UniProtKB/Swiss-Prot annotation:
This is Retinoic acid receptor RXR-beta. A zinc finger (NR C4-type) spans 205-225, 241-265. The lineage of its organism: Eukaryota, Metazoa, Chordata, Craniata, Vertebrata. Residues 1-23, 36-181, 276-299, 313-336 are annotated as: Disordered. Residues 205-270 bind DNA. It comes from Homo sapiens.
Protein backbone atom coordinates (compact mmCIF):
# COMPACT_ATOMS: atom_id res chain seq x y z
CA UNK A 1 0.00 0.00 0.00
CA UNK A 2 1.48 3.31 -1.03
CA UNK A 3 1.83 6.30 1.15
CA UNK A 4 -0.79 8.14 -0.86
CA UNK A 5 -3.38 5.47 -0.03
CA UNK A 6 -2.88 5.90 3.63
CA UNK A 7 -6.15 6.54 5.48
CA UNK A 8 -6.67 10.02 6.84
CA UNK A 9 -6.11 8.92 10.41
CA UNK A 10 -2.32 8.75 9.86
CA UNK A 11 -1.66 12.20 11.33
CA UNK A 12 -3.48 11.15 14.47
CA UNK A 13 -1.20 8.10 14.71
CA UNK A 14 1.79 10.40 14.25
CA UNK A 15 0.56 12.70 16.95
CA UNK A 16 0.03 9.77 19.27
CA UNK A 17 3.52 8.51 18.55
CA UNK A 18 2.45 5.26 16.78
CA UNK A 19 4.42 3.23 14.26
CA UNK A 20 5.29 4.24 10.73
CA UNK A 21 8.39 5.72 9.08
CA UNK A 22 7.41 9.27 9.78
CA UNK A 23 5.99 8.26 13.06
CA UNK A 24 9.27 6.65 14.09
CA UNK A 25 11.11 9.88 13.45
CA UNK A 26 8.45 11.81 15.32
CA UNK A 27 8.57 9.25 18.10
CA UNK A 28 12.29 9.81 18.50
CA UNK A 29 11.80 13.55 18.35
CA UNK A 30 9.02 13.46 20.88
CA UNK A 31 11.18 11.38 23.18
CA UNK A 32 13.85 14.07 23.11
CA UNK A 33 11.20 16.71 23.73
CA UNK A 34 9.87 14.79 26.70
CA UNK A 35 13.29 14.82 28.26
CA UNK A 36 13.52 18.56 27.59
CA UNK A 37 10.15 19.03 29.28
CA UNK A 38 11.42 17.27 32.36
CA UNK A 39 14.53 19.53 32.42
CA UNK A 40 12.69 22.71 31.36
CA UNK A 41 9.40 22.86 33.29
CA UNK A 42 8.66 26.33 32.03
CA UNK A 43 8.13 25.02 28.47
CA UNK A 44 4.47 24.39 27.54
CA UNK A 45 3.90 20.78 26.33
CA UNK A 46 0.97 21.82 24.16
CA UNK A 47 3.01 24.46 22.35
CA UNK A 48 5.86 22.04 21.79
CA UNK A 49 3.50 19.37 20.30
CA UNK A 50 1.92 21.90 17.94
CA UNK A 51 5.31 23.07 16.75
CA UNK A 52 6.42 19.45 16.16
CA UNK A 53 3.33 18.66 13.98
CA UNK A 54 3.70 21.92 12.03
CA UNK A 55 7.38 21.37 11.40
CA UNK A 56 6.88 17.99 9.81
CA UNK A 57 10.11 16.32 8.79
CA UNK A 58 12.23 19.53 9.00
CA UNK A 59 15.46 19.09 10.89
CA UNK A 60 15.98 20.90 14.11
CA UNK A 61 17.84 24.20 13.41
CA UNK A 62 21.14 24.79 15.14
CA UNK A 63 21.09 27.20 18.03
CA UNK A 64 22.20 30.72 17.49
CA UNK A 65 25.08 32.08 19.53
CA UNK A 66 22.81 34.29 21.54
CA UNK A 67 20.40 31.48 22.39
CA UNK A 68 23.21 29.15 23.34
CA UNK A 69 24.58 31.76 25.65
CA UNK A 70 21.27 32.21 27.43
CA UNK A 71 20.76 28.48 27.91
CA UNK A 72 24.35 27.96 28.97
CA UNK A 73 25.00 25.47 26.10
CA UNK A 74 27.57 25.68 23.31
CA UNK A 75 28.47 22.96 20.86
CA UNK A 76 26.75 20.15 22.80
CA UNK A 77 24.09 19.70 20.11
CA UNK A 78 21.17 20.68 22.33
CA UNK A 79 18.65 23.18 20.95
CA UNK A 80 16.66 25.48 23.18
CA UNK A 81 14.11 25.88 20.38
CA UNK A 82 13.18 22.16 20.05
CA UNK A 83 9.45 21.71 19.26
CA UNK A 84 7.26 20.40 21.96
CA UNK A 85 4.01 18.43 21.85
CA UNK A 86 1.57 21.29 22.41
CA UNK A 87 1.35 25.04 22.70
CA UNK A 88 -1.58 27.27 23.59
CA UNK A 89 -0.54 29.89 21.04
CA UNK A 90 0.85 28.10 18.01
CA UNK A 91 3.40 30.09 16.00
CA UNK A 92 3.77 30.16 12.23
CA UNK A 93 5.88 27.48 10.61
CA UNK A 94 9.62 28.20 10.75
CA UNK A 95 9.35 30.83 13.52
CA UNK A 96 10.83 29.56 16.79
CA UNK A 97 8.98 30.30 20.00
CA UNK A 98 10.63 32.73 22.39
CA UNK A 99 12.30 31.01 25.23
CA UNK A 100 12.02 32.50 28.69
CA UNK A 101 15.26 33.74 30.22
CA UNK A 102 17.05 31.17 32.24
CA UNK A 103 18.83 31.66 35.54
CA UNK A 104 21.98 33.81 35.24
CA UNK A 105 25.21 31.87 34.99
CA UNK A 106 28.36 32.89 36.80
CA UNK A 107 30.98 34.51 34.55
CA UNK A 108 33.60 32.09 33.36
CA UNK A 109 37.15 33.03 32.48
CA UNK A 110 38.24 29.46 31.80
CA UNK A 111 39.80 28.78 28.42
CA UNK A 112 37.55 26.95 25.94
CA UNK A 113 37.91 23.24 25.32
CA UNK A 114 38.02 23.67 21.56
CA UNK A 115 40.87 25.13 19.57
CA UNK A 116 40.87 28.83 18.71
CA UNK A 117 39.50 29.54 15.25
CA UNK A 118 38.45 25.87 14.59
CA UNK A 119 35.02 25.00 13.10
CA UNK A 120 32.34 23.98 15.56
CA UNK A 121 32.32 20.25 16.38
CA UNK A 122 29.34 18.04 15.40
CA UNK A 123 26.33 17.94 17.70
CA UNK A 124 26.62 15.77 20.76
CA UNK A 125 23.83 13.87 22.55
CA UNK A 126 22.30 15.53 25.60
CA UNK A 127 23.97 15.04 28.96
CA UNK A 128 22.46 12.87 31.69
CA UNK A 129 19.70 14.31 33.74
CA UNK A 130 21.81 14.46 36.83
CA UNK A 131 24.41 16.83 35.37
CA UNK A 132 24.25 20.03 37.41
CA UNK A 133 25.91 22.24 34.77
CA UNK A 134 25.95 22.26 30.98
CA UNK A 135 28.94 21.41 28.91
CA UNK A 136 31.59 24.12 28.69
CA UNK A 137 31.17 26.12 25.52
CA UNK A 138 33.67 25.88 22.71
CA UNK A 139 35.63 28.65 21.08
CA UNK A 140 32.40 29.83 19.42
CA UNK A 141 31.08 30.98 22.78
CA UNK A 142 28.21 33.33 23.14
CA UNK A 143 28.86 37.03 22.72
CA UNK A 144 27.33 37.66 26.07
CA UNK A 145 30.20 35.95 27.87
CA UNK A 146 33.70 37.39 28.20
CA UNK A 147 36.24 36.16 25.61
CA UNK A 148 38.68 33.40 26.52
CA UNK A 149 41.72 34.46 28.50
CA UNK A 150 44.95 35.09 26.51
CA UNK A 151 47.87 32.69 26.93
CA UNK A 152 49.78 35.08 29.13
CA UNK A 153 46.85 35.74 31.45
CA UNK A 154 47.91 35.18 35.02
CA UNK A 155 44.74 36.01 36.92
CA UNK A 156 42.87 33.51 39.11
CA UNK A 157 40.16 31.31 37.64
CA UNK A 158 36.92 31.23 39.60
CA UNK A 159 34.31 29.34 37.60
CA UNK A 160 32.26 26.44 39.00
CA UNK A 161 32.01 24.98 35.50
CA UNK A 162 35.65 23.95 35.56
CA UNK A 163 35.13 21.27 38.19
CA UNK A 164 31.80 19.98 36.82
CA UNK A 165 31.32 16.60 35.19
CA UNK A 166 32.02 16.82 31.45
CA UNK A 167 29.63 14.81 29.29
CA UNK A 168 31.19 12.27 26.95
CA UNK A 169 29.74 10.89 23.71
CA UNK A 170 27.35 8.05 24.32
CA UNK A 171 25.76 9.56 27.40
CA UNK A 172 28.55 8.58 29.80
CA UNK A 173 30.21 10.81 32.33
CA UNK A 174 33.94 11.19 32.72
CA UNK A 175 35.74 11.80 35.98
CA UNK A 176 35.92 15.40 37.10
CA UNK A 177 39.01 17.22 35.87
CA UNK A 178 40.41 19.85 38.19
CA UNK A 179 41.92 22.67 36.19
CA UNK A 180 44.56 24.40 38.30
CA UNK A 181 45.00 28.12 37.92
CA UNK A 182 48.09 29.08 35.93
CA UNK A 183 51.15 30.07 37.85
CA UNK A 184 51.79 33.80 37.97
CA UNK A 185 54.53 34.57 35.48
CA UNK A 186 57.64 36.52 36.35
CA UNK A 187 56.76 39.11 33.73
CA UNK A 188 53.85 40.20 35.84
CA UNK A 189 55.98 40.89 38.87
CA UNK A 190 58.09 43.98 39.46
CA UNK A 191 61.24 42.99 41.29
CA UNK A 192 63.25 45.94 42.67
CA UNK A 193 67.01 45.85 41.96
CA UNK A 194 69.11 44.39 44.74
CA UNK A 195 70.93 46.87 46.93
CA UNK A 196 74.32 45.60 45.78
CA UNK A 197 73.51 45.62 42.06
CA UNK A 198 75.20 47.57 39.32
CA UNK A 199 73.02 50.60 39.91
CA UNK A 200 74.17 51.06 43.50
CA UNK A 201 77.31 52.66 44.80
CA UNK A 202 78.27 54.73 41.75
CA UNK A 203 81.54 56.57 42.30
CA UNK A 204 82.74 59.75 40.67
CA UNK A 205 86.15 60.69 39.41
CA UNK A 206 88.16 62.38 42.16
CA UNK A 207 89.75 64.74 39.62
CA UNK A 208 86.99 65.97 37.31
CA UNK A 209 83.79 64.56 38.83
CA UNK A 210 82.90 62.40 35.82
CA UNK A 211 81.72 58.81 36.27
CA UNK A 212 84.54 56.67 37.61
CA UNK A 213 85.52 53.50 35.77
CA UNK A 214 87.41 52.10 38.76
CA UNK A 215 90.48 52.67 40.85
CA UNK A 216 93.46 53.74 38.74
CA UNK A 217 96.90 54.43 40.21
CA UNK A 218 95.41 54.55 43.70
CA UNK A 219 92.47 56.90 43.04
CA UNK A 220 88.93 56.43 41.71
CA UNK A 221 89.05 58.19 38.35
CA UNK A 222 87.53 58.19 34.89
CA UNK A 223 89.19 56.86 31.77
CA UNK A 224 90.07 60.36 30.59
CA UNK A 225 92.00 61.37 33.71
CA UNK A 226 93.59 57.93 33.89
CA UNK A 227 94.96 58.23 30.36
CA UNK A 228 96.05 61.83 30.91
CA UNK A 229 98.06 60.92 34.00
CA UNK A 230 99.61 57.88 32.32
CA UNK A 231 100.73 59.89 29.27
CA UNK A 232 102.16 62.61 31.46
CA UNK A 233 104.28 60.19 33.47
CA UNK A 234 105.45 57.98 30.63
CA UNK A 235 106.39 60.88 28.37
CA UNK A 236 107.64 63.06 31.25
CA UNK A 237 105.57 65.99 30.02
CA UNK A 238 105.71 69.41 31.65
CA UNK A 239 102.90 71.94 31.70
CA UNK A 240 102.47 75.58 32.62
CA UNK A 241 99.43 77.47 33.85
CA UNK A 242 98.43 80.73 32.17
CA UNK A 243 96.45 81.90 35.19
CA UNK A 244 97.14 81.74 38.92
CA UNK A 245 97.48 77.93 39.13
CA UNK A 246 94.00 77.62 40.57
CA UNK A 247 91.98 76.73 37.49
CA UNK A 248 88.72 74.83 37.81
CA UNK A 249 89.06 71.17 36.88
CA UNK A 250 85.69 69.55 36.25
CA UNK A 251 84.01 67.43 33.61
CA UNK A 252 83.61 70.30 31.16
CA UNK A 253 86.85 72.20 31.79
CA UNK A 254 89.30 69.39 32.52
CA UNK A 255 91.11 69.91 29.20
CA UNK A 256 91.43 73.65 29.67
CA UNK A 257 94.55 73.70 31.88
CA UNK A 258 96.79 70.64 31.84
CA UNK A 259 99.00 72.00 34.60
CA UNK A 260 96.19 72.31 37.13
CA UNK A 261 94.76 68.97 36.06
CA UNK A 262 98.09 67.24 36.64
CA UNK A 263 98.54 68.94 40.01
CA UNK A 264 95.06 67.81 41.03
CA UNK A 265 95.92 64.24 40.01
CA UNK A 266 98.90 64.33 42.36
CA UNK A 267 96.93 66.08 45.11
CA UNK A 268 94.21 63.43 45.09
CA UNK A 269 96.79 60.70 45.55
CA UNK A 270 97.64 59.36 42.09
CA UNK A 271 101.00 57.59 42.22
CA UNK A 272 103.62 57.98 39.54
CA UNK A 273 105.25 54.73 40.53
CA UNK A 274 102.00 52.89 39.84
CA UNK A 275 102.29 53.83 36.17
CA UNK A 276 105.79 52.44 36.03
CA UNK A 277 104.78 49.26 37.84
CA UNK A 278 101.91 48.78 35.41
CA UNK A 279 104.25 48.91 32.44
CA UNK A 280 106.79 46.72 34.20
CA UNK A 281 104.14 44.07 34.89
CA UNK A 282 103.24 44.04 31.21
CA UNK A 283 106.86 43.48 30.30
CA UNK A 284 107.18 40.71 32.86
CA UNK A 285 104.26 38.89 31.22
CA UNK A 286 105.96 39.15 27.82
CA UNK A 287 109.32 38.12 29.23
CA UNK A 288 111.04 41.20 27.81
CA UNK A 289 111.90 43.01 31.03
CA UNK A 290 113.04 42.44 34.54
CA UNK A 291 110.77 42.44 37.57
CA UNK A 292 110.15 45.54 39.61
CA UNK A 293 112.13 44.05 42.47
CA UNK A 294 115.25 43.83 40.32
CA UNK A 295 115.23 47.50 39.31
CA UNK A 296 117.38 48.78 42.23
CA UNK A 297 120.05 46.22 41.38
CA UNK A 298 119.96 47.25 37.71
CA UNK A 299 120.29 50.94 38.62
CA UNK A 300 122.06 51.07 42.02
CA UNK A 301 121.88 54.42 43.75
CA UNK A 302 125.35 54.06 45.21
CA UNK A 303 126.88 54.25 41.73
CA UNK A 304 124.82 57.35 41.00
CA UNK A 305 126.12 58.89 44.23
CA UNK A 306 129.69 58.02 43.26
CA UNK A 307 129.23 59.86 39.97
CA UNK A 308 128.07 63.00 41.80
CA UNK A 309 130.95 62.93 44.27
CA UNK A 310 133.55 62.32 41.54
CA UNK A 311 132.37 65.30 39.48
CA UNK A 312 132.28 67.51 42.59
CA UNK A 313 135.88 66.64 43.47
CA UNK A 314 137.00 67.33 39.90
CA UNK A 315 135.33 70.74 40.01
CA UNK A 316 137.06 71.59 43.31
CA UNK A 317 140.44 70.60 41.87
CA UNK A 318 139.84 72.78 38.84
CA UNK A 319 139.02 75.72 41.04
CA UNK A 320 142.10 75.34 43.21
CA UNK A 321 144.54 74.36 40.46
CA UNK A 322 146.77 76.76 38.57
CA UNK A 323 145.06 78.67 35.89
CA UNK A 324 141.72 78.19 37.59
CA UNK A 325 139.17 80.94 37.71
CA UNK A 326 138.45 80.45 41.40
CA UNK A 327 138.58 83.30 43.82
CA UNK A 328 136.36 86.28 43.77
CA UNK A 329 139.30 88.66 43.39
CA UNK A 330 140.34 87.34 39.99
CA UNK A 331 136.85 87.14 38.54
CA UNK A 332 135.29 89.89 36.49
CA UNK A 333 132.46 91.87 37.91
CA UNK A 334 129.93 90.93 35.20
CA UNK A 335 127.71 88.13 36.59
CA UNK A 336 126.74 86.96 33.10
CA UNK A 337 130.41 86.40 32.20
CA UNK A 338 130.95 84.44 35.42
CA UNK A 339 127.96 82.21 34.68
CA UNK A 340 129.13 81.59 31.09
CA UNK A 341 132.64 80.63 32.20
CA UNK A 342 131.27 78.27 34.87
CA UNK A 343 128.91 76.66 32.37
CA UNK A 344 131.72 76.15 29.84
CA UNK A 345 133.81 74.49 32.52
CA UNK A 346 130.93 72.30 33.68
CA UNK A 347 130.29 70.96 30.19
CA UNK A 348 133.44 68.87 30.44
CA UNK A 349 132.61 67.44 33.85
CA UNK A 350 129.04 66.82 32.66
CA UNK A 351 130.26 64.36 30.05
CA UNK A 352 132.38 62.57 32.63
CA UNK A 353 129.44 62.41 35.00
CA UNK A 354 127.21 60.85 32.30
CA UNK A 355 129.81 58.16 31.62
CA UNK A 356 129.60 57.09 35.26
CA UNK A 357 125.83 56.69 35.22
CA UNK A 358 124.96 52.97 34.86
CA UNK A 359 124.07 51.82 31.32
CA UNK A 360 124.69 55.21 29.71
CA UNK A 361 127.92 54.14 28.04
CA UNK A 362 126.21 51.06 26.59
CA UNK A 363 123.98 53.25 24.42
CA UNK A 364 125.00 54.07 20.83
CA UNK A 365 127.38 57.02 20.58
CA UNK A 366 124.93 59.09 18.58
CA UNK A 367 122.24 58.54 21.19
CA UNK A 368 124.63 59.66 23.94
CA UNK A 369 125.27 62.93 22.09
CA UNK A 370 121.54 63.47 21.56
CA UNK A 371 120.73 62.91 25.24
CA UNK A 372 123.44 65.28 26.47
CA UNK A 373 122.46 67.93 23.97
CA UNK A 374 118.79 67.68 25.00
CA UNK A 375 119.39 67.97 28.75
CA UNK A 376 122.71 69.71 29.43
CA UNK A 377 121.07 73.00 30.46
CA UNK A 378 118.73 71.34 32.97
CA UNK A 379 121.56 69.19 34.32
CA UNK A 380 123.76 72.22 35.01
CA UNK A 381 120.92 74.23 36.58
CA UNK A 382 120.05 71.35 38.93
CA UNK A 383 123.71 71.04 39.93
CA UNK A 384 124.40 74.69 40.88
CA UNK A 385 120.91 75.04 42.45
CA UNK A 386 121.66 72.23 44.90
CA UNK A 387 125.12 73.66 45.51
CA UNK A 388 123.48 76.97 46.54
CA UNK A 389 121.28 75.55 49.33
CA UNK A 390 123.40 77.17 52.05
CA UNK A 391 123.66 80.50 50.22
CA UNK A 392 121.23 83.33 50.91
CA UNK A 393 119.89 85.42 48.03
CA UNK A 394 122.41 84.08 45.55
CA UNK A 395 123.91 81.07 43.78
CA UNK A 396 127.28 79.39 44.09
CA UNK A 397 128.95 78.45 40.80
CA UNK A 398 131.26 75.49 40.23
CA UNK A 399 134.19 77.91 39.97
CA UNK A 400 133.56 78.98 43.57
CA UNK A 401 132.11 82.35 42.58
CA UNK A 402 129.06 83.73 44.34
CA UNK A 403 126.50 85.61 42.24
CA UNK A 404 124.17 87.77 44.34
CA UNK A 405 120.58 88.53 43.48
CA UNK A 406 121.25 92.27 43.12
CA UNK A 407 124.01 91.66 40.58
CA UNK A 408 121.70 89.50 38.49
CA UNK A 409 119.03 92.20 38.49
CA UNK A 410 121.54 94.84 37.46
CA UNK A 411 122.66 92.63 34.55
CA UNK A 412 119.11 92.21 33.25
CA UNK A 413 118.59 88.56 34.24
CA UNK A 414 116.79 89.19 37.52
CA UNK A 415 113.50 87.49 36.53
CA UNK A 416 114.99 84.12 35.70
CA UNK A 417 117.39 84.42 38.63
CA UNK A 418 114.48 84.86 41.05
CA UNK A 419 112.77 81.78 39.62
CA UNK A 420 115.88 79.71 40.29
CA UNK A 421 115.93 80.89 43.88
CA UNK A 422 112.23 80.37 44.63
CA UNK A 423 111.34 77.27 42.60
CA UNK A 424 114.58 75.31 42.94
CA UNK A 425 116.98 76.47 45.64
CA UNK A 426 114.29 77.21 48.22
CA UNK A 427 112.45 73.93 47.63
CA UNK A 428 115.64 71.88 47.82
CA UNK A 429 116.56 73.63 51.05
CA UNK A 430 113.15 73.04 52.64
CA UNK A 431 113.10 69.30 51.98
CA UNK A 432 116.85 68.90 52.59
CA UNK A 433 117.52 67.09 49.36
CA UNK A 434 120.66 64.94 49.60
CA UNK A 435 123.20 64.20 46.85
CA UNK A 436 121.78 60.76 46.10
CA UNK A 437 118.37 62.24 45.35
CA UNK A 438 119.99 64.97 43.28
CA UNK A 439 121.92 62.38 41.27
CA UNK A 440 118.74 60.37 40.60
CA UNK A 441 116.88 63.46 39.42
CA UNK A 442 119.70 64.30 37.06
CA UNK A 443 119.75 60.72 35.78
CA UNK A 444 116.01 60.98 35.06
CA UNK A 445 116.68 64.15 33.08
CA UNK A 446 119.52 62.45 31.21
CA UNK A 447 117.47 59.42 30.11
CA UNK A 448 114.90 61.36 28.09
CA UNK A 449 113.08 59.03 25.66
CA UNK A 450 111.39 62.01 23.95
CA UNK A 451 114.67 63.46 22.66
CA UNK A 452 114.49 63.77 18.89
CA UNK A 453 116.69 61.53 16.78
CA UNK A 454 117.15 58.57 19.15
CA UNK A 455 117.70 55.24 17.44
CA UNK A 456 115.99 53.27 20.23
CA UNK A 457 113.76 55.43 22.46
CA UNK A 458 112.24 52.40 24.19
CA UNK A 459 115.64 51.39 25.56
CA UNK A 460 116.13 54.86 27.01
CA UNK A 461 112.66 54.75 28.53
CA UNK A 462 113.46 51.45 30.26
CA UNK A 463 116.55 53.04 31.81
CA UNK A 464 114.48 55.97 33.07
CA UNK A 465 111.97 53.63 34.66
CA UNK A 466 114.78 51.86 36.47
CA UNK A 467 115.91 55.17 37.92
CA UNK A 468 112.33 55.85 39.05
CA UNK A 469 112.18 52.53 40.87
CA UNK A 470 115.60 52.98 42.48
CA UNK A 471 114.77 56.48 43.72
CA UNK A 472 111.43 55.37 45.16
CA UNK A 473 113.05 52.47 47.01
CA UNK A 474 115.72 54.78 48.37
CA UNK A 475 113.15 57.29 49.66
CA UNK A 476 111.14 54.58 51.42
CA UNK A 477 114.22 53.16 53.09
CA UNK A 478 115.97 56.42 53.98
CA UNK A 479 112.87 58.50 54.82
CA UNK A 480 110.11 56.05 55.83
CA UNK A 481 108.20 58.73 57.75
CA UNK A 482 107.90 60.96 54.65
CA UNK A 483 105.50 59.09 52.39
CA UNK A 484 105.18 61.92 49.89
CA UNK A 485 108.89 62.61 49.52
CA UNK A 486 109.22 60.73 46.25
CA UNK A 487 106.40 62.76 44.71
CA UNK A 488 107.93 66.04 45.92
CA UNK A 489 111.19 65.14 44.25
CA UNK A 490 109.49 64.46 40.94
CA UNK A 491 107.64 67.77 41.13
CA UNK A 492 110.98 69.59 40.70
CA UNK A 493 111.36 68.21 37.19
CA UNK A 494 108.72 70.46 35.53
CA UNK A 495 110.30 73.53 37.14
CA UNK A 496 113.74 72.48 35.89
CA UNK A 497 112.39 72.06 32.37
CA UNK A 498 110.71 75.46 32.32
CA UNK A 499 113.68 77.34 33.80
CA UNK A 500 116.12 75.49 31.54
CA UNK A 501 114.31 76.62 28.41
CA UNK A 502 114.32 80.22 29.61
CA UNK A 503 118.02 80.08 30.43
CA UNK A 504 118.80 78.81 26.94
CA UNK A 505 117.34 81.98 25.51
CA UNK A 506 119.67 84.11 27.65
CA UNK A 507 122.72 81.94 27.15
CA UNK A 508 122.39 81.78 23.39
CA UNK A 509 121.79 85.49 23.38
CA UNK A 510 125.09 86.05 25.20
CA UNK A 511 126.83 83.49 22.96
CA UNK A 512 127.69 81.05 25.69
CA UNK A 513 129.53 78.60 23.45
CA UNK A 514 130.95 81.11 21.01
CA UNK A 515 131.61 79.89 17.47
CA UNK A 516 131.96 76.19 18.44
CA UNK A 517 128.80 74.17 17.77
CA UNK A 518 127.66 72.24 20.78
CA UNK A 519 127.33 69.03 18.79
CA UNK A 520 131.01 69.08 17.78
CA UNK A 521 132.15 69.87 21.32
CA UNK A 522 130.13 67.07 22.88
CA UNK A 523 131.28 64.59 20.25
CA UNK A 524 134.92 65.31 21.03
CA UNK A 525 134.33 64.89 24.77
CA UNK A 526 132.50 61.59 24.33
CA UNK A 527 135.27 60.15 22.15
CA UNK A 528 137.96 61.10 24.72
CA UNK A 529 139.17 58.40 27.15
CA UNK A 530 137.66 58.09 30.62
CA UNK A 531 139.74 60.55 32.64
CA UNK A 532 138.03 60.09 36.00
CA UNK A 533 138.56 56.36 36.36
Amino acid sequence: MSWAARPPFLPQRHAAGQCGPVGVRKEMHCGVASRWRRRRPWLDPAAAAAAAVAGGEQQTPEPEPGEAGRDGMGDSGRDSRSPDSSSPNPLPQGVPPPSPPGPPLPPSTAPSLGGSGAPPPPPMPPPPLGSPFPVISSSMGSPGLPPPAPPGFSGPVSSPQINSTVSLPGGGSGPPEDVKPPVLGVRGLHCPPPPGGPGAGKRLCAICGDRSSGKHYGVYSCEGCKGFFKRTIRKDLTYSCRDNKDCTVDKRQRNRCQYCRYQKCLATGMKREAVQEERQRGKDKDGDGEGAGGAPEEMPVDRILEAELAVEQKSDQGVEGPGGTGGSGSSPNDPVTNICQAADKQLFTLVEWAKRIPHFSSLPLDDQVILLRAGWNELLIASFSHRSIDVRDGILLATGLHVHRNSAHSAGVGAIFDRVLTELVSKMRDMRMDKTELGCLRAIILFNPDAKGLSNPSEVEVLREKVYASLETYCKQKYPEQQGRFAKLLLRLPALRSIGLKCLEHLFFFKLIGDTPIDTFLMEMLEAPHQLA
